[in-house]
Amino acid sequence: MSFNHHTIEELHELLVAKDISAVELTKATLEDIKAREEAVGSFITIAEEAALKQAAALDAKGIDPDNVMSGIPLAVKDNISTKGILTTAASKMLYNYEPIFDATAVANAYDKDMIIIGKTNMDEFAMGGSTETSYFKKTKNAWDRSRVPGGSSGGSATAVASGQVRLSLGSDTGGSIRQPAAFNGVVGLKPTYGAVSRYGLIAFGSSLDQIGPFAPTVRENAQLLTVIAGSDRKDSTSAPVQIADYTSKIGQDIKGMKIALPKEYLGEGIDPKIKETVLAAAKHFEKLGAIIEEVSLPHSKYGVAVYYIIASSEASSNLQRFDGIRYGFRAADAKSLEDIYVKTRSQGFGDEVKRRIMLGTFSLSSGYYDAYFKKAGQVRTLIIQDFEKVFADYDLILGPTAPTAAFELDTLNHDPVAMYLADLLTIPVNLAGLPAISIPAGFADGLPVGLQLIGPKYSEEVIYQAAAAFEATTDYHKQQPMIFGGDS
């Protein structure tokens, strides 16, 4: 029996009433995963033995009636450390790496008695926008298996969209939660920088990375964020902010809420069908009582260039630790220490990772630092100031999540610049450290279209309020792909 159509609260009621046990729910989830895995390829590791053991222990202890997450399975992106469970970052470099500690986000999930069911596929070291750079497999879109799921958290998005799991965790450095959420018609949120601990997240861009939740609905997404968020002494970038319940404003009306619509987000490079969907969503918000006005974010057009200098520079530094000495892959044919370094990194990293390491090393090198990295930091400040000016007068910003719907497999993975431009609407949010959500807002040629809502720092509750108001008066989130059991 499958329980993938039940909300978290419905599952909780069944568990508390003992209509099902945690073991039965875990077994049913494992069956859902296996039944769909060949079609979509969401997972790198299915932690069957560990999950069933954890579920049995929970049944023996008893489900906590006051903890809605008790006994709920959770899929985790494979760059988030899980003690005793392979954590590969989808790279040959870490093909055999089992961490000896849990990421704080995972530890928080365990504290709420959630069941870690497996590790999801991703772009290698989170570098990509299509989940095609993984060393292990290419994940496929839940709605059309000839198309990409987005990236880099593609596996976490398809796992939810295809009905394998109800909840999953991803990470977002330049759009890696929101873009795959949009491509697969699910809800994905990138929290404020510092709202969720990065301890245990395999670093890509340290000033940009954030762990965040995927779910089929806004409320369930907020419930999962409530579990993983919070201040953490183990993370020096963790913010001293504690929100007790991110669902607190869900259900409140949005009359009088001021929402900005940047003209740059509907300009050059945006598919006309995406633009049409977003403008229709804006009108829907007006019907709900919100005030929609056009604004300008003039420096957002530089976001992609700024991002790829800063993110690649940080990656070139972060990835120096992978050298074949301490853990992970080591080249077998090396004859000296230098040979180990060179051959291990040449053979262990994929092409996209090596491309970004080289770009970052160049940007940080003597003679080019001021021209590239320093200049990128200055323009980043201008992007931040643009957002601050808008948020002085508006509660939220509305726009498309991605400039197109999901593109076909093997079309952009050989064109790095085109792939990078797919993130042009999500990147500025990371550069400014802001929270943003992608919610289902319609379809273009049968493929899901995501609507992005951006807020000032620590405004996740308001973002959820607006997103839930839209969701409650539309049915896009209820439409499911055939693999889930839907009509499309």
From Swiss-Prot:
Keywords noted in UniProt = ATP-binding, Ligase, Nucleotide-binding, Protein biosynthesis
Protein's GO biological process:
translation
Task: Give the first-level EC class, as a single word.
Answer: ligase
Molecular-function GO terms, alphabetical? ATP binding; glutaminyl-tRNA synthase (glutamine-hydrolyzing) activity
Q: Which reaction does it catalyse?
A: L-glutamyl-tRNA(Gln) + L-glutamine + ATP + H2O = L-glutaminyl-tRNA(Gln) + L-glutamate + ADP + phosphate + H(+)
What GO cellular component term, any one, is given?
A: glutamyl-tRNA(Gln) amidotransferase complex
The record's section on SUPFAM superfamilies has: Amidase signature (AS) enzymes
This entry's Enzyme Commission designation comes to 6.3.5.7
Listed InterPro entries:
Amidase, Amidase_CS, Amidase_dom, AS_sf, GatA
Q: Does the keyword Protein biosynthesis apply?
A: yes
What is annotated as the active site? K77 (charge relay system), S152 (charge relay system), S176 (acyl-ester intermediate)
Family listed: Belongs to the amidase family. GatA subfamily.
User: Quaternary state and partners of this protein?
Assistant: Heterotrimer of A, B and C subunits.
What does the UniProt function comment say about this protein? Allows the formation of correctly charged Gln-tRNA(Gln) through the transamidation of misacylated Glu-tRNA(Gln) in organisms which lack glutaminyl-tRNA synthetase. The reaction takes place in the presence of glutamine and ATP through an activated gamma-phospho-Glu-tRNA(Gln).
The record's PANTHER family line, in alphabetical order, gives: GLUTAMYL-TRNA(GLN) AMIDOTRANSFERASE SUBUNIT A, TRANSAMIDASE
Concerning NCBIfam families, the annotation shows: gatA (TIGR00132)
**This chain belongs to which protein, by name?**
Glutamyl-tRNA(Gln) amidotransferase subunit A
Query: What species is this protein from?
Result: Streptococcus equi subsp. zooepidemicus (strain MGCS10565)
Encoding gene (name):
gatA
